[in-house]
């Protein structure tokens, strides 16, 4: 079974400027815009906003 293009792999980059990133999958039908999640950034030591990069 092939991977669906409906759920592509995206990279989330930290907005704190540390260069940290997470890799996740998203559903294009439910989230057509760029994904933004608050996740833990170990370089800063707290939760910050991570945005999808292309």
UniProtKB/Swiss-Prot annotation:
One of its GO terms (cellular component) is cytosolic large ribosomal subunit. It comes from the Bacteria. The keyword Ribonucleoprotein applies. One of its GO terms (molecular function) is structural constituent of ribosome. Keywords: Ribonucleoprotein, Ribosomal protein. Pfam families: Ribosomal_L33. InterPro entries: Ribosomal_bL33, Ribosomal_bL33_CS, Ribosomal_bL33_sf, Ribosomal_zn-bd. GO terms for biological process: translation. The keyword Secreted does not apply. Gene3D superfamilies: Ribosomal protein L33. NCBIfam families: PRK00595.1, rpmG_bact. HAMAP family: Ribosomal_bL33. Belongs to the bacterial ribosomal protein bL33 family. This is Large ribosomal subunit protein bL33C. It comes from Streptomyces griseus subsp. griseus (strain JCM 4626 / CBS 651.72 / NBRC 13350 / KCC S-0626 / ISP 5235). The gene is rpmG3.
């Amino acid at each position: 079974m092939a991977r669906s293009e409906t759920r592509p792999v995206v990279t989330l980059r930290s907005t704190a400027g540390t260069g940290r990133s997470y890799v996740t999958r998203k559903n294009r039908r439910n989230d057509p815009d760029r994904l933004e999640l608050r996740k833990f950034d170990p370089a800063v030591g707290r939760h910050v906003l991570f945005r999808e990069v292309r």
